[in-house]
Amino acid sequence: MVKQVFNFNAGPSALPKPALERAQKELLNFNDTQMSVMELSHRSQSYEEVHEQAQNLLRELLQIPNDYQILFLQGGASLQFTMLPMNLLTKGTIGNYVLTGSWSEKALKEAKLLGETHIAASTKANSYQSIPDFSEFQLNENDAYLHITSNNTIYGTQYQNFPEINHAPLIADMSSDILSRPLKVNQFGMIYAGAQKNLGPSGVTVVIVKKDLLNTKVEQVPTMLQYATHIKSDSLYNTPPTFSIYMLRNVLDWIKDLGGAEAIAKQNEEKAKIIYDTIDESNGFYVGHAEKGSRSLMNVTFNLRNEELNQQFLAKAKEQGFVGLNGHRSVGGCRASIYNAVPIDACIALRELMIQFKENA
């Protein structure tokens, strides 16, 4: 029986132990209510305090300006692929997309159903091994927005910085790297992120949106799919995912206790360096997928010399308590997802496994 598990799952992923222990302690009696937080009315003061605390912590940690609204929605980032063009892609405008992997492809696919689209840049030709140079972006005067995916979990690439554009709002899917580093929110018209990688459990999607961008009612769009509905109701138009938001609050408290975005970024850089150095020093035994200038701090993707070795390595890893190291089903190989809550000890243990496996191969 495995005594310790190292969780490298790509999502849902590792959660901070202090956040889980807090939930365990409060599960049956939240704030002396004699009820679980899951049992509270979303209109009650006890829950509304949690809701507000989560918003305030996120605003503090990301230094979100006051002219931006924080929304807690449902449906994952995948629903945002549809909601975004429904609300912004009006007649005569173009939804402009930068393709850096499968998730940006899916976002573009949904937008095509709703209006005119354009591919600003793509690295599909090189198997999504890199982020395109900003100078290659093809922009249009009538762009409704420019959409990017900040981190690409399947291919292990990440924007090291972000384009500064003035002609249209920059929209970012940050599902897999939000709050992994400091961020200038005012560079973006909107940021959205499913919580289940860096912010909490699955069930809640965080949207950070400039108020003047999406607070106007859009004709012919169903009420629940209008951002204006949720801005006006402070994400309480219908019953929100209360427990997921409660856990989000716990995780944000944990990040604050660690020292915030700058501290977590330093820790993430250290974790990624441990694994990337092991790959680079292996004399080709391990081969990274992403080009060095585009490497992700969240998802380290790599292969061994052949598929037989890949499978042997993954089997050995599983035997020793490593969970979630299989690459995405669409590309294979190996992937270590090292989101905020993955401890540095897990990365050190993975390095030792990789070195040991190479020596014995």
Swiss-Prot record:
GO molecular function, one term: pyridoxal phosphate binding
Enzyme class: transferase
Principal location listed in the UniProt entry: cytoplasm
Key words, A-Z: Amino-acid biosynthesis, Aminotransferase, Cytoplasm, Pyridoxal phosphate, Serine biosynthesis, Transferase
Pathway per the UniProt entry: Amino-acid biosynthesis; L-serine biosynthesis; L-serine from 3-phospho-D-glycerate: step 2/3
Binding site for L-glutamate: 43
Keyword Ribosomal protein: no
Cell compartment(s), UniProt: Cytoplasm
Protein's recorded name: Phosphoserine aminotransferase
